[in-house]
């Protein structure tokens, strides 16, 4: 898994950072997990949220995770996460902790079997249609995240 993660990062660095462009690769970036946590905190721990964060804006520290628990200030979220170039897509639902390892393996296997083609198409669709934005404040500065739909604060669904 480590070799796959390194190959993935190298490919993204070439596609997104363009190391031949000045300063693009040297800018420090927050971890994707920090953006996830800060977004949930900024939204005051919503019942659910679904958003995209550009690969180019974060360090992908959650590589290989597809479905997992994410605790934030006493609340727990079930997070569905996938890389859908040029974004990382998150769907978070507040729910009690449970063992999500079988689903995590299942969703990861689906992505591998499908060669990532559906997630690539979803990412390109998101790139075309995600027009609602929000700024997430991180320890590395502001990060813009994208939504396909405007989310109503406090909505259950």
UniProtKB/Swiss-Prot annotation:
InterPro entries: DUF4528 (IPR029245). It comes from the Eukaryota. Pfam families: DUF4528 (PF15031). GO terms for cellular component: extracellular region. Keywords: Secreted, Signal. It is found in: Secreted. Residues 1-23 form the signal peptide. Its main location: secreted. This is Uncharacterized protein C15orf61 homolog. It comes from Mus musculus (Mouse).
